[in-house]
Amino acid sequence: MKSLKKQRRIQVIILATVALVLATGLIGYAMRDGINFFRAPSDIIAEPPQPSETFRIGGLVEDGTLVRGQGETVRFSVTDGGASVPVVFTGVLPDLFAENQGMIGTGRYVNGVFEASEILAKHDETYMPKEVMDALKEQGVYQAPES
């Protein structure tokens, strides 16, 4: 009788372990498209990502680079003070989007151009995303806003 209980306990433990491994694998598989890593322009130039990789880029919209094309296509460059990456975006830009202002874009880096699928602008005059602030500090061009 004891060996039957012991055998049942071992079966339950094995089944629970298999279920846990399977659940972890399914969660990881489901999240693979939902995780976007942040990169500064200097990081992209130093180590260009694969064209199939979706990630976020952040920095300042470089002065004098904002060009509105046909329809809703917009071209500009993003800089962190150390490097500059050209960006192309088709869609409606946020109201607060402007040259020399902070932005974060989501998209892919293809043939030396970041093809953005989404553009976010900073919220107000003093807000800057932490990732962008860190990248600008790393390049030595960050200026704290006047309070």
From Swiss-Prot:
Pfam family, one: CcmE
Binding site for heme: 123, 127
Biological processes per GO annotation: cytochrome complex assembly
One GO cellular component term noted in the UniProt record for this chain: plasma membrane
Alphabetically ordered keywords of this record: Cell inner membrane, Cell membrane, Cytochrome c-type biogenesis, Heme, Iron, Membrane, Metal-binding, Signal-anchor, Transmembrane, Transmembrane helix
Bilayer topology annotation: Single-pass type II membrane protein
Membrane spanning residue stretches: 10-30
Stored NCBIfam families: PRK13254.1-1, PRK13254.1-5
Protein family: Belongs to the CcmE/CycJ family.
Matching HAMAP family: CcmE
Described purpose of this protein according to its UniProt entry: Heme chaperone required for the biogenesis of c-type cytochromes. Transiently binds heme delivered by CcmC and transfers the heme to apo-cytochromes in a process facilitated by CcmF and CcmH.
Protein's recorded name: Cytochrome c-type biogenesis protein CcmE 1
Upper classification of the organism: Bacteria, Pseudomonadati, Pseudomonadota, Alphaproteobacteria, Rhodobacterales
